[in-house]
């Protein structure tokens, strides 16, 4: 397996694994711990740095950016599938749980029932398995491109 594919698979697998940790521990329901999910960004950036370091000897800046972006594409495909499985099979009540946690956070912030209802309704449109999976893909691709632009400046053939 080439380095691009290997790194992309590792990124995707570790991000899905962390998502499952968030699910099985129930952290996604806890307002104090829900942001721990964003550790996936650090995982992606760190593994992109490792992967691009391994391809740096033979590739210039542009090729390194392309390679890093392709690593993110591979990861995004795995994350898309993992996200769909997470919200439809492993945790089918995920969106109801997220709504309940959102309501709790808004109540704790002193919002009125009308404000809470408006916020929950506004968020509801994006709370579907497909929308959630596509958001994961978009986040992975954007992070991959931006991180690759920076990492390639330091790890490339000169």
Give the location of each predicted region.
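Transmembrane alpha-helical segments in integral membrane proteins
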Residues: 129-158
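Helix-loop junctions at the membrane-solvent interface of multi-pass transporters
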Residues: 24-29, 85-90, 154
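Alpha-helical transmembrane segments of multipass membrane proteins
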Residues: 14-22, 44, 75-79, 83, ...
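Transmembrane alpha-helical insertion/packing segments
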Residues: 1-52
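Short membrane-interface loop/juxtamembrane segments of multi-pass integral membrane proteins
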Residues: 104-128
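Membrane-helix interface/capping segments
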Residues: 52-64
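Alpha-helical transmembrane segments of multi-pass membrane proteins
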Residues: 2, 6-10, 66-75
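Functional transmembrane-helix hotspots
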Residues: 82-109
């Amino acid at each position: 397996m080439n380095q691009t594919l290997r790194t992309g698979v590792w990124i995707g697998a570790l991000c899905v694994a962390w998502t499952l940790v968030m699910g099985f521990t129930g952290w996604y329901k806890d307002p104090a711990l829900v942001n721990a999910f964003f550790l996936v960004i650090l995982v992606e950036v760190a593994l992109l740095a490792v992967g691009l370091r391994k391809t740096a000897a033979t590739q210039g800046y542009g090729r390194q950016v392309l390679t890093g972006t392709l690593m993110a594409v591979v990861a995004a495909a795995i994350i898309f599938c993992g996200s769909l499985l997470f919200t439809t099979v492993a945790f089918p009540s995920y969106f109801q749980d997220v709504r309940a946690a959102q309501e709790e956070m808004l109540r704790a912030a002193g919002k009125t029932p009308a404000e809470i209802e408006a916020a929950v309704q506004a968020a509801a449109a994006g709370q579907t398995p497909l929308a959630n999976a596509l958001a994961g893909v978009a986040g992975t691709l954007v992070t991959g491109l931006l991180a690759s632009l920076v990492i390639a400046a330091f790890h490339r053939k000169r």
